[in-house]
């Protein structure tokens, strides 16, 4: 059984110590055999120790070799991990740069969204303001039109009253022969007697003139100025037939025309009729495009009484004469202003009516300019884009109002009128 290396080393050390500790006198007393035996034993122990030391060295070298291999493997692993770490670091830098770019782009989009929303909101507010201004202007125009209509009716009533007073003062001589004609004139107006008898004729300046014939004589004809008669041959009606025709014409006329005399030679009547026709045509222009044609035709027909429509047709353009006689085959074009020759002189026009005509012309010019400027501002495509953007904004506001009560309460104040 071999001794352990530590035990052998300890024994060799002990033997050497024993030999070194033995004094020289003791060594001299030993015999040669004893010295040789002790020497051989010490050499054997030394050889054993050297063998054990060599084994230990081989073991240590083997372990060192293993440790070196492990160190190399760990170095390789460490290098690989460092490479992976470097790649991950570069990837993190790339992702961080991408994140920074994404944040910057998001901020840009956010600023663009705020700017676009502000611009859309401003445009919507401006459009709503324009709509409110247009509505207010339309209401003002409607009120002015109503006032002008009332003014025209008041002027007609005043003229009828003045004509009635003049006719009552100048027609006392032929009362017996005008009994039937006066009963018919009560329906058509006091001045109707001037066409069938010797009644007074009011010229608008406060004076009255009478004709020479008797009230019921058939040789007395109604005098009409040549400028107001339609072109072509004219047939003069006799007394009874003319009176009957005028009575039937006045009965078929509109209610507010029955109180207006039919004296076409009167300057006020010559001026009031085209003015009333123009007011009705202005009202007809506000109808939708589908109803414009028939509405203008009805307005034209309504503006002329059956008795004096021929004289007023003569003052209209040929296209309107065909439409009034045959009916509207297509939408009627816009009626121009009545010619100045139809009106009486400026000195005979009432001041209020002249002012009303100036107001009408100013409003017509403003409406035409406003319509042209509105059409030139935006094209149809731009209008469609603005309407779509407004609808998107209102949908967003509706979604926000469904979640936030404050926005719902703010929108319930009717500040805006909803999507276009």
From Swiss-Prot:
It holds the Pfam family CCDC85. Residues 165-271 are annotated as: Disordered. Keywords: Acetylation, Cell junction, Coiled coil, Developmental protein, Phosphoprotein, Tight junction. The modification Phosphoserine is found at residues 179, 247. InterPro entries: CCDC85. Residues 166-176 have a biased composition (Gly residues). Residues 185-212 have a biased composition (Low complexity). One of its GO terms (cellular component) is apical junction complex. The keyword Protease does not apply. One of its GO terms (biological process) is establishment of protein localization. Residues 26-92, 122-165 form a coiled coil. The keyword Acetylation applies. The modification N-acetylalanine is found at residue 2. It is found in: Cell junction, Tight junction; Cell junction, Adherens junction. Disruption phenotype: Disrupted in the hemorrhagic hydrocephalus (hhy) mutant. The mutant animals shown sucortical heterotopia and non-obstructive hydrocephalus with frequent brain hemorrhage. Predominantly expressed on the surface of the lateral ventricular walls of the developing cerebral cortex. May interact with ARVCF, CTNND1, CTNND2 and PKP4. Belongs to the CCDC85 family. May play a role in cell-cell adhesion and epithelium development through its interaction with proteins of the beta-catenin family. May play an important role in cortical development, especially in the maintenance of radial glia. This is Coiled-coil domain-containing protein 85C. The lineage of its organism: Eukaryota, Metazoa, Chordata, Craniata, Vertebrata.
């Amino acid at each position: 059984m071999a001794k352990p290396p530590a035990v052998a080393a300890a024994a060799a050390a002990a033997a050497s110590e024993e030999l070194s500790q033995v004094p020289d006198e003791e060594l001299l007393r030993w015999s040669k055999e004893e010295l040789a035996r002790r020497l051989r034993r010490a050499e054997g122990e030394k050889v054993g120790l050297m063998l054990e030391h060599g084994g230990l060295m081989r073991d240590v070298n083997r372990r060192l070799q293993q440790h070196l291999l492990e160190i190399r493997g760990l170095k390789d692993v460490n290098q690989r991990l460092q490479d992976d770490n470097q790649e991950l670091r570069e990837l993190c830098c790339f992702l961080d740069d991408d994140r920074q770019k994404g944040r910057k782009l998001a901020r840009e989009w956010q600023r663009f969204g705020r700017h676009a929303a502000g611009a859309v909101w401003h445009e919507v507010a401006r459009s709503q303001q324009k709509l409110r201004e247009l509505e207010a202007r339309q209401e003002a125009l409607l009120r002015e039109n109503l006032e002008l209509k009332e003014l025209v009716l008041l002027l007609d009533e005043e003229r009828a009253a003045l004509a009635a007073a003049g006719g009552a003062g100048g027609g006392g001589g032929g009362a017996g022969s005008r009994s039937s004609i006066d009963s018919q004139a009560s329906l058509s107006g006091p001045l109707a007697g001037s066409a069938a008898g010797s009644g007074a004729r009011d010229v608008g300046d406060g004076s009255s003139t009478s004709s020479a014939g008797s009230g019921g004589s058939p040789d007395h004809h109604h005098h009409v100025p040549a400028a107001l008669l339609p072109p072509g041959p004219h047939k003069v009606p006799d007394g009874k037939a003319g009176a009957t025709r005028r009575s039937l014409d006045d009965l078929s006329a509109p209610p507010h025309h029955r109180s207006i005399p039919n004296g076409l030679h009167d300057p006020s009547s010559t001026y009031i009729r085209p003015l009333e026709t123009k007011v009705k045509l202005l009202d007809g222009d506000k109808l939708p495009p589908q109803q414009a044609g028939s509405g203008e035709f009805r307005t034209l027909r309504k503006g002329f009484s059956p008795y004096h429509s021929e004289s007023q047709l003569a003052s209209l353009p040929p296209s309107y004469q065909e439409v009034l006689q045959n009916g509207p085959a297509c939408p009627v074009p816009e009626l121009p202003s009545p010619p100045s020759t139809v009106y009486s002189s400026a000195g005979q026009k009432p001041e209020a009516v002249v002012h009303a005509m100036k107001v009408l012309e100013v409003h017509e010019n403003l409406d035409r300019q406003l319509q042209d400027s509105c059409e030139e501002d935006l094209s149809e495509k731009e209008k469609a884009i603005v309407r779509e953007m407004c609808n998107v904004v209102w949908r967003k506001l509706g979604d926000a109002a469904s979640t936030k009560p404050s926005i719902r309460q703010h929108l319930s104040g009717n500040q805006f009128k909803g999507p276009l």
